[in-house]
Amino acid sequence: SSAASDVYKRQVVYHANYIKFFERARSEFLSDNKISQSELKKNDQAFVIKSVNIKYIAAAELGDNIYVESEVEKKSNARMIFNQKVINCDNEKEYAIGVVEVCFINLVTKKPQKFPDDLLLIFD
């Protein structure tokens, strides 16, 4: 991924865009594992963010090639906590580290719902 579309006039990545990078990485992971968020939505199910905690270490700049490393720290029937890092592809420099708490809900009731078994399996 390139940080090119997410930069300030000063040529550094705007702080809020690191949340977008985290989101893209989680979405790509689901897609790569054949979990369709649009299909979940048709079944009145969705992922929602309960909390995000980010520590900014350095600013990514225009032209930096980055990737996001993600791991599930903890999971329960309706909640997962991800540790995520935005890292430079060329020199492994860390730009930001984050902890993201994701819940699974029923869109009609707006209440937590158990993850489907196939989804839980990909996080083992």
Question: Which residues does each PLM region occupy?
Answer:
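Short, small-residue-biased leader/transition segments that mark boundaries at the very start
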Residues: 1-8
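Early exported N-terminus immediately downstream of N-terminal targeting peptides
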Residues: 16-18
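Helix-loop element at the rim of GNAT/NAT acetyltransferase active sites that forms part
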Residues: 25
